[in-house]
């Protein structure tokens, strides 16, 4: 009969090598994934920093009736940079999402997949939060520009309601603001100049909001759909922590009780020994 021991040993070694290869490939994949996570987090942090700088530029522009061109150019550069970086983040998050969906479609479930889903959800939420802050910043700036236009119109003697002013802004025609204004003083001319400046800022702002709207809604819907899953994970983690804390507490109590029992046992043994010595001495005295 042919000895197959060596053949079986060779086959086992080959299987072991395959397992090692799969493990190494998986570890390398997760290392690359975490590098990507850090890159995305860095992009989101960069957007957050730019949003704060945008707020400062808004305040500087509103503080001057005729802001200098350099400040306005710097604001446009910041807005452009935010848009480019946001598109990068969205693209990378989409790529991770598709990768996760492919594995779920194959009914694969692993610790690595759960980690990737959690990281993707966390990054998506953080991204939507920073973009929500940017959107709120833009909306606030629009309202402040609108308020300045309304005040300048009042200076020229023209009173408008908020709804009327909104209709004028939506028309996109700057000439509509000059209608009915008598240009007989430098005050009226200066007021109209600021009105045109603020109107121009609002138009740029609305274009920026429009460009980012679809992306923002897409990511917001994604995060909303993930909300229940994240809440469930957080619930499980919290209960796991409570369970561990109770287990540690119970263990400490058990150790404490065990220690007390051990001390009692030792004391009983010592008492028995002493009692034995006393009895032995007494008996010895009687018969001695």
Swiss-Prot record:
Region of interest (Disordered), ranges: 1-20
Domain t-SNARE coiled-coil homology: 192-254
PTM notes: Phosphorylated by CK2. Phosphorylation at Ser-188 by DAPK1 significantly decreases its interaction with STXBP1. (Microbial infection) Targeted and hydrolyzed by C.botulinum neurotoxin type C (BoNT/C), which hydrolyzes the 253-Lys-|-Ala-254 bond. Cleavage inhibits neurotransmitter release.
Residue(s) of cross-link: Glycyl lysine isopeptide (Lys-Gly) (interchain with G-Cter in SUMO): 252-253, 256
UniProt protein name: Syntaxin-1A
Localisation per UniProt entry: Cytoplasmic vesicle, Secretory vesicle, Synaptic vesicle membrane; Cell membrane; Synapse, Synaptosome
Gene name linked to the record: Stx1a
Broad class of where this protein is predominantly found: membrane
Annotated site residue numbers, (Microbial infection) Cleavage: 253-254
Summary of the tissues where the protein is detected: Expressed predominantly in cerebral cortex, hippocampus, cerebellum, adrenal medulla and retina with weak expression detected in non-neuronal tissues.
Biased composition (Basic and acidic residues): 1-13
GO process annotations (BP): calcium-ion regulated exocytosis; exocytosis; hormone secretion; insulin secretion; intracellular protein transport; modulation of excitatory postsynaptic potential; neurotransmitter transport; positive regulation of calcium ion-dependent exocytosis
Keyword Transcription regulation: no
Organism: Rattus norvegicus (Rat)
Coiled coil (UniProt feature): 68-109
Topology Cytoplasmic: residue spans: 1-265
Topological relation to the membrane, as annotated: Single-pass type IV membrane protein
One Gene Ontology cellular component annotation held by this UniProt entry: neuron projection
SUPFAM superfamilies per record: t-snare proteins
Quaternary context: Part of the SNARE core complex containing SNAP25, VAMP2 and STX1A; this complex constitutes the basic catalytic machinery of the complex neurotransmitter release apparatus. The SNARE complex interacts with CPLX1. Interacts with STXBP1. The interaction with STXBP1 promotes assembly of the SNARE complex. Interacts (via C-terminus) with KCNB1 (via C-terminus); the interaction increases in a calcium-dependent manner and induces a pore-independent enhancement of exocytosis in neuroendocrine cells, chromaffin cells, pancreatic beta cells and from the soma of dorsal root ganglia (DRG) neurons.
SMART domains according to UniProt: SynN, t_SNARE
One of the record's GO molecular function terms: myosin binding
Protein role: Plays an essential role in hormone and neurotransmitter calcium-dependent exocytosis and endocytosis. Part of the SNARE (Soluble NSF Attachment Receptor) complex composed of SNAP25, STX1A and VAMP2 which mediates the fusion of synaptic vesicles with the presynaptic plasma membrane. STX1A and SNAP25 are localized on the plasma membrane while VAMP2 resides in synaptic vesicles. The pairing of the three SNAREs from the N-terminal SNARE motifs to the C-terminal anchors leads to the formation of the SNARE complex, which brings membranes into close proximity and results in final fusion.
One Pfam family matching this protein: SNARE
Modified residues (Phosphoserine): 14, 64, 95, 188
Residues that span the membrane, as ranges: 266-288
């Amino acid at each position: 009969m042919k000895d197959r021991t060596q053949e079986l040993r060779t086959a086992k070694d080959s299987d072991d090598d395959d397992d090692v290869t799969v493990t190494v490939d998986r570890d390398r994949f997760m290392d690359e994934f975490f590098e990507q996570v850090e890159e995305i987090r860095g992009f989101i942090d960069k957007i957050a920093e730019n949003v704060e700088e945008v707020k400062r530029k808004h305040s500087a522009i509103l503080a001057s009736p005729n802001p200098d061109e350099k400040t306005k150019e710097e604001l446009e550069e910041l807005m452009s940079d935010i848009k480019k970086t946001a598109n990068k983040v969205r693209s990378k998050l989409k790529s991770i999402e598709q990768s996760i969906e492919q594995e779920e479609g194959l009914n694969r479930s692993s610790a690595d997949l759960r980690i990737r889903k959690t990281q993707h959800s966390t990054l998506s939420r953080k991204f939507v939060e920073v973009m929500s802050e940017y959107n709120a910043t833009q909306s606030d700036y629009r309202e402040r520009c609108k308020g300045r236009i309304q005040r300048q119109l009042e200076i020229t003697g023209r009173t408008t309601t908020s709804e009327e002013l909104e209709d004028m802004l939506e028309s996109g025609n700057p000439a509509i603001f000059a209608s009915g204004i008598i240009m007989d003083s430098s005050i009226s001319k200066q007021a109209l100049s600021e009105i045109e400046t603020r109107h121009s800022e609002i138009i740029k702002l609305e274009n920026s909001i429009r460009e980012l709207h679809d992306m923002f809604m897409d990511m917001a819907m994604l995060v909303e759909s993930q909300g229940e899953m994240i809440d469930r994970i957080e619930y499980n983690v919290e209960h796991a922590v409570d369970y561990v804390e109770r287990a540690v507490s119970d263990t400490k109590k058990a150790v404490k009780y065990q220690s007390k029992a051990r001390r009692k046992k030792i004391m009983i043994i010592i008492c028995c020994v002493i009692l034995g010595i006393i009895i032995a001495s007494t008996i010895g005295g009687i018969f001695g």
